[in-house]
Design a protein with these regions (language model features):
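Short, low-complexity disordered leader/linker segments with a strong preference
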Residues: 1-42, 119-124
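Hinge/cleft segment of the Venus flytrap/periplasmic-binding protein
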Residues: 12, 25-27, 32-39, 178, ...
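Extracytoplasmic "Venus flytrap"
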Residues: 42-61, 65, 69, 76-90, ...
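Hydrophobic alpha-helical segments within soluble ligand-binding/sensing domains
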Residues: 43, 89, 149-175, 217-218, ...
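Short, solvent-exposed amphipathic alpha-helices that sit
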Residues: 54-69, 157-161, 185-204, 217, ...
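Short beta-strand elements in bilobed, periplasmic/extracellular small-molecule ligand-binding domains
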Residues: 68-82, 174-177, 195-215
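Hydrophobic alpha-helical
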Residues: 106-123, 194, 206-207, 211-272
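Flexible loop/hinge segments that line or gate small-molecule binding clefts
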Residues: 111-112, 116-156, 167, 174, ...
Length: 322
């Protein structure tokens, strides 16, 4: 595998340098070296929405890691404009493949829709590592490709956040879940984890709705839920952006302090609300390290040729008690 990667570098180097300038949301060249003589592995990080603070932290962490290890690899960072722009993410994958990168670390917007282009990358001997949102395992098996997932156990993390919320509720209380994109594995796992915790505490989930990870959609959904279920005691949101939207709706309804809210991701704004007591809890999956975990593992695969396997990364519950 290593020889195949080296053989592509001369052909792809100038294309990679051009891509650093042409991709709309991408990293500039990490150093002043001549791309034509640069024998370092070329790594592309492709994320979801760069409007989300979580992915900004992920990108910053990756850049800092590359800056601390400039001799090990070069890096280009890409993101899409919104969480559901699958076509743009596919286009970014294809563009990075055309430049002859050695590694693609991807946080896919959808667990199935990105797999065909990911398979083409693997067939080109590009090391592909999946982070954040897990690719569909059944479809991977049907395609007969090995793409490792490096990331947290989303169901367990959401369950533990839900348990923290349940400690403030009573059996029979009513809650609703505001989830992410239905086609995303991590969205389904977080909703399942929230449900696990509520069922264990004999708390009633009156509704589960998708806000596609978006703050404004979550605000609209939360407003409707508050009207439909006037006895609603809590909202469990599958990411912090949606938790912020839900909180805005609760404030507008004049129910601050009555309707409890939890999130997931531990972005800065949410962490501040946890510390002030306005948000019960969130989950920290360490955005600034998540891409780094993926990059490190991809470089290990590239160097050793080992068969890739999944790796679980930390997730911690953040509450006023932590």
């Amino acid at each position: 595998m290593q020889n195949a990667h080296r053989s592509r570098r001369i052909l792809g180097a100038w294309l990679f340098t051009s891509a650093l300038l042409l991709v709309g949301c991408s990293e500039k060249a990490p150093d002043g070296s001549d791309a034509g003589t640069d024998d370092r592995p070329r790594v592309a990080l492709i994320m979801k929405s760069l409007a989300n603070e979580f992915f900004i932290s992920m990108a910053d962490g990756a850049r800092a890691h590359q800056a601390a290890n400039p001799e090990r690899y070069s890096l280009v960072v890409n993101g899409i404009k919104n969480e559901s722009d699958l076509a743009q993410q596919v286009a970014l994958m294809e563009q990075m493949m055309a430049t002859g990168v050695d590694v693609i670390v991807i946080a896919p917007a959808d667990s199935k829709a990105l797999l065909p282009v990911a398979r083409r990358a693997v067939q080109q001997d590009i090391v592909v590592v999946n982070i954040d949102n897990q690719f569909d395992r059944q479809l991977l098996a049907e395609m007969d490709i090995a793409i490792p997932f490096v990331g947290p156990d989303n169901r367990d993390g959401a369950r533990r956040v839900g348990e923290r919320l349940a400690a403030e509720l009573e059996p029979g209380d009513e809650v609703a879940i505001i989830g992410g994109i239905p086609g995303a594995f991590n969205a389904r796992e977080r909703a399942a984890g929230f449900t696990d915790a509520m069922q264990a505490a004999d708390i009633t989930v009156v509704s589960t709705q998708a806000a596609d990870w978006e703050q404004s959609k979550a605000a609209s959904i939360a407003s409707a839920l508050l009207r439909e279920y006037p006895q609603l005691d809590a909202l469990l949101c599958a990411n912090d952006s949606m938790a912020l939207g839900a909180m805005a709706a609760v404030r507008q309804a004049g129910r601050s302090g009555e309707v409890r809210i939890v999130g997931f991701d531990n972005i800065g704004a949410a962490n501040a609300l946890v510390q002030s007591g306005e948000l019960v809890a969130t989950a920290d999956q360490h955005a600034d390290r998540l891409a780094v975990y993926g990059i490190e593992y991809a470089l290990e695969i590239l160097e050793t040729g080992q068969i890739p396997t999944d790796r679980t990364t930390p997730v911690d519950v953040i509450s006023g008690e932590s």
